[in-house]
Amino acid sequence: MGLTKNFAFLVFCCQRYCSMDGEAFEISLLDGEEDRFGGTVVNLMEVESMTIGDFDSKLDVSLKAWKDQGKKGIWIKLPSELSSLVDTAIKKGFTYHHAENEYVMLTFWLPEPPSTLPCNASHRIGIGAFVLNKNGEMLVVQENSGYFKDKNVWKVPTGTIKEGESIWAGAVREVKEETDIDAEFVEVLSFMESHQAVWQRKTDIFFVCELEARTFEIQKQDSEIHAAKWMPVEEYVNQPYHNKEGNEMFKLIANICLKRSREKYTGFVLTTNSAKKSLYCSVDHANLLKETADQASTSLSD
């Protein structure tokens, strides 16, 4: 039994061929790890060098072996140093999946289509910060660039969540970067989906967060912000921009901010937070969850 397993391992690690003059030679397979879904992940990030010819021959025998093994999705992670190998993989049927600064990920679905491989990142996460001071005024900015440049529109500080960053932390960071205001996260008021918003393909999810200001003296970020100030909430809501056709979503968000400033609206508070996970729920249930955290889950059914 053990001998059979070892023989199978050797067969799948390399293939033996004969040269034109009859001499035998072996071509090793690309080193890959099986994933949870019956596929194989080939990580070449630690490979210092590989010629196109060597990669071509190894990929040929690897694809044959993977098909014989009944593998499904094949993933190849190529570092930028081996970018010359991309064309070879594409010609054999691989497609681009995603790329980062230091690598490109290629995929190949071996069974009959359709492929069930997940797409790359489908959404971008943005935040808008509704920041109130002790006088009930809100923090607003005008931008140096982007869609709102030269439109004379006052808007809340906005930005994009960084990789590995929580929504609440991103809101606090953006406010600090753009206005130098220290603020404390209160709750998520609402969120909006905008399809085909990123490169005319990806969806943008925009979270509106309420923050409470802890400092009040504004120092704008010169590189991105044209102007910043504290403004009465009603004045912000009544800007002509919010009443223009096509801007209904912006008007709804502005009205949510107005209702929240009058304490007639509640959103989602941060109930638990760890290094990798954050849970938000309605204010009405937050205290209940904290009170019953140690109870059996069946006791929460009411």
UniProtKB/Swiss-Prot annotation:
A motif (Nudix box) lies at residues 159-180. The keyword Manganese applies. Expressed in roots, stems and leaves. Its EC number is 3.6.1.-. Its cofactor is Mg(2+); Mn(2+). Keywords: Hydrolase, Magnesium, Manganese, Metal-binding. Residues 122-254 form the Nudix hydrolase domain. GO terms for molecular function: hydrolase activity; metal ion binding. It holds the Pfam family Nudix_hydro. One of its GO terms (cellular component) is cytosol. Mg(2+) binds at E174, E178. InterPro entries: NUDIX_hydrolase-like_dom_sf, Nudix_hydrolase6-like, NUDIX_hydrolase_CS, NUDIX_hydrolase_dom, Pre-Nudix. Belongs to the Nudix hydrolase family. Probably mediates the hydrolysis of some nucleoside diphosphate derivatives. This is Nudix hydrolase 5. It comes from Arabidopsis thaliana (Mouse-ear cress). The lineage of its organism: Eukaryota, Viridiplantae, Streptophyta, Embryophyta, Tracheophyta.
